[in-house]
Amino acid sequence: MRLLFVGDVVSSAGCDFLAEKLYGIKKDYAIDITVVNGENSAVGNGITKQSCSALTNIGADVITTGNHAFKRRESLDMFDTVEHLLRPVNYSDEVIGKGVYTLDMGRCRVAVVNLMGVVYMSPLAN
């Protein structure tokens, strides 16, 4: 099984670049699962419904986030409605969304866990 992890996709320029390159990369390397960090995919930072949809449409199977996950109030409901959009699992259980997503690949199941490090950052409910 081949996994592709794409780091911070930043703004519409990052989404556009990924849209241009991802299909070819997935095809050339026979990628089975693509995980994309989308927490800065909106203009400025955060994630919006538009940038989440764009990342999904260009081939992200799972979208992870971090400390900018909830920067956009208008997008908060996505964390409870978009199954493959993750917030850090080490946030408090009372925080909206989930931090684990399981993909059924037919021959096996793959769980993607979104953990956030906290070096030089505010502590979390670990």
Language-model regions: role of each:
Residues 1-126:
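Acidic, metal/ion-coordinating pockets
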